[in-house]
Amino acid sequence: MKQLFYLFASLLMLIPSACGLELCAQEADSLIVISKEDMTLRLIDGQGGDILKFPIACGKNYGNKRKSGDMKTPEGVFSISEIVDASYWTHDFGDGKGEIAGAYGPFFIRLETPGHRGIGIHGTHKPESIGTRDTEGCIRLHNEDLCHLVEYVRVGMTVVITPSYKDALAGQ
C-alpha cells in the first residue's frame, strides 16, 4: 500500500504535461508542492531545489476533497487564480465565537480547484494550529511565512498537493 502511495505521488508530478497545463507557469522556473504527509509547503525552483519550505496546517479529515464542507484538502495539480489582500476578512468557525477578524491572515492565494470553491493558501489567527490537521480544506501558513511566499508566487503558478499515506487509505 505504501508503494502505491509513493507511485501516486510520483505520478502527480507528471500530470501537468499530460493535461496540457504549463508545469511551472509561463517562465517554467518554479512551482509549489504541498505534502499532506510531511505537512509542508515547498517552493521549488526549475532544477528541483527548495527556494522556501514552510510548515502547514491542512484539512481536518483525511482523504481527497469530494464536496463542500467535508473538511478535506483537495489533492492533485492546481494553479493560482488570484492573490488577494485578506487582512480585513473574517470567518465564523461555528464554535460560538462568531466572526473572527484576521482568520485568513494578510493574504489569500486562491487556487483554481475544479468542482470546489474557496480553496487556497492563507495565514491564520491561530498559529498553534500549524503542523496539525485543523482547516476546513485550505492550506494554512504562519502569517510571516505567507508574507514571504507572496513575494515569489504569481497567478498561473502550478500548485501540486500530494496525499499522506492515511489520505490514500481514506480514498479506498
Residue ranges and their predicted role:
Residues 1-4:
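Positively charged n-region of N-terminal signal peptides that target proteins for export
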Residues 38-40, 77, 108, 118:
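Structural motif
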Residues 52-54, 78, 117-119:
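Short beta-strand segments
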Residues 78-79, 159:
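Generic structural signal for buried aliphatic residues
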Residues 7-17:
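Bacterial N-terminal signal peptides
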Residues 21-68, 75, 161-172:
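Intrinsically disordered, low-complexity
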Residues 26-27, 68-71, 86-172:
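Exported/periplasmic cell-wall-interacting domains
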